[in-house]
Amino acid sequence: LVRCLGDVNDKRIKAIAKVESAGSGWFESGLPKILYERHKFWKHVRKAVNRVVAWFANPTAGDYTMDANRNGINDSWEKLALAIGKEPLAALMSVSIGKFQVMGEYYAQCGYNHPIEMLHACSRSEMAQYELLVSYILNVAKILPAYNMLSTNPERCRAFARAYNGAGYEKN
């Protein structure tokens, strides 16, 4: 798969996985890792009436909790469920998915017909998560040159980090 990126080994992809998801695409529960991003939901809802200023819909990023109510379910999955009740497509476009935390909003550019299809693929296979990363690098962010510059030198990684995570990447 790394050959699709013109690479000869998997060191770069492993480094991305380590930064994006601590190296795993799965929670201990067996569910794929997601991060519900309330500011993305706010952006994607089609009707302003469905915008509820709360922990699951807000114009400001934040409130990334793991299990605030201690029920054993990752909060991102709970927030996603509540958002789906308001606006399903917007909700599914508002999560970053899997080992490489690719946003659901990029489902079409990554070759899926719907964001639920992208989430389902990533829930079934780690290989699908790797394929999603390759598709994102080549088709969405178009950051292959920055990917090829990744190295153990942090300065050489900045261009990729900025392109992959946006201008505010240093906050994370």
Question: What residue spans do the PLM features occupy?
Answer:
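Catalytic glycan-binding domains that act on GlcNAc-containing polysaccharides
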Residues: V2-N172
